[in-house]
Amino acid sequence: GGPGQELTLSYAISGKKAPGCVCLSIDSEGTDGTTKVAGGITDSTSYDAAEAKGINVFDALRGHACFEALDAIGDAVFTGNTGTNLCDLNIMYVPELPGKPRKGSRIRSVHARQIIDCKCRPMVEVDVITEDGSIGTAAAPTGSSVGMYESFVLRDNDPAEYNGLSVHKAVANVNDIIAPALIGMDAMDQAAIDRCMIELDGTENKTNLGGNAIYSVSVACYRAAAASCKRPLYDYIAGGRIKTVPIPSFNVLNGGMNAGIRQAFNEFIVMPYRASDIEQAVEIAVKVFNRLGTVIRAYTGAEPRVGGSYGWCAPSEDPEVCLDLIQKAIDDCGYSEQCAFALDCAMTEMYDREHKTYYLNGSQVTNDELVAYVKRLTEKYNFVFIEDMLDEDDWDGFVKAHREITRTYIIADDLTVSNPARIRRAYELKAIDGFILKPNQVGTITEALAAHKFASEHGMFSVTSGRSGGVVGDVVMDLAVGLQIPFIKNGCPRSGERIDKLNFLMRVKDNYPGCHMAKIDDIVRF
């Protein structure tokens, strides 16, 4: 550190470097305060100039850096006498660098076992251990409603164990087939690891080895790589400063068939998008959810029932009645100005393929009628987004909805299943504004990141979401923070894995001074 460091680094960069040498200048708390990247020379380009030109500084580093250089303090250049002391120096590690593996990050062992998810269904869990002793553990959640284009969940179909839901075959595939192929590979080369498993499987939807087997290994390797760098996974993903945590949204009312009432729409969601901070957003969710129980009791004259996703069961077939009850709970709590709605319609579950109609409010309707109905809802209520308002194969319906509904965002889940090819098709057809990012749907971290990258480069949203059969410590939270996603689906403020996600966001915010909850006031459409 010091006044001369930029000049020295500029000279070093312009000179002839030995193969594999990287020159980095990184300030932390110097006398002139915290700077970004060396005030900042990197690859002969200042940080501000790179930012103005749209150059990603971390991409610039990827072009020159190698693992050995970052491991060896002797490869760095230090000058000056008033800046950063050696003991304060922050060595910046850039993930997925080309070249040789970082010392110690090679995979030493891969081991799978059967555990149970938060709905007490068996799932695959995997431990990956690197040569330096770093451990990554991950499990594969599953949803209650699963799109037909998702990666295949391999189960044993043995009625004698968990009614056929056990996953011993998938566990064996990890231990006997995947593990031998990955041992010795670099845990930090995520793309190579995922490519290896996809090639071992040899099918489009990962039906041979099981998407649940492949996904668990993929995430475990991701975690092991971050652990090898001694960084939280979300920080490893971000590659830079964490500026925001996403706005959580809460599924407070569950649709489907409950207590004899068939509510077509699956999830009625509250988003406290104008909360002052993440702590207030969580408090709003808890208070509104609890108050909603009282409001439902007054409406029905009976105790509210708990739905399949732990929200309250919808007390009416009429979506407007449900929305009005939620709005009353919001108003009663004094949060009318802070909250908006979202909907997950999950209309694939309500689609009659033979007659090509949808069940809605006691009747069968065409996609034209469904689009017109939802459009009227968006004109009456404020929605941040509406998800899966049509069947997973109703491309024409989605195009029509996207064209005609302009007061909210049209988001897809079953239509896109986090698959880059399907997201590209939806973009080219102008069918959606964004998609729900559930990495286990597509089956590997690499494919999930590719889906997010395509969406962000083409002006679409990625909205991370857990699964109803969730896990504690879900990687979707690391992705949401690391990718700086503006808003997410969290589920209702009840049950351990959902509360864990909320606590995760509050911890991240607390650990990064200046970090705040994302703001979307300037992008909502109402």
Q: What are the language-model segments listed below?
A:
Residues 302-303, 319-526:
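Catalytic core of soluble alpha/beta enzymes
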Residues 243-305, 310:
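Mobile "lid/hinge" segments at catalytic clefts and subdomain interfaces of large enzymes
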Residues 13, 91-93, 124-132, 136-142, ...:
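Short beta-strand elements
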Residues 18-25, 57-61, 79-81, 186-193, ...:
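Flexible, glycine/charged-enriched surface loops at secondary-structure junctions
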Residues 1-2, 75-88, 115-126, 205-226, ...:
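Conserved phosphate/anionic-ligand binding catalytic regions in large, soluble enzymes, centered on
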Residues 98-124:
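Short, Gly/Pro- and small/polar-rich lid/capping loops
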Residues 141-231, 282, 311:
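Metal- or metallocofactor-binding catalytic centers and their adjacent structured scaffolds
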Residues 1-68, 73-77, 83-85:
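Active-site histidine-anchored catalytic micro-motif
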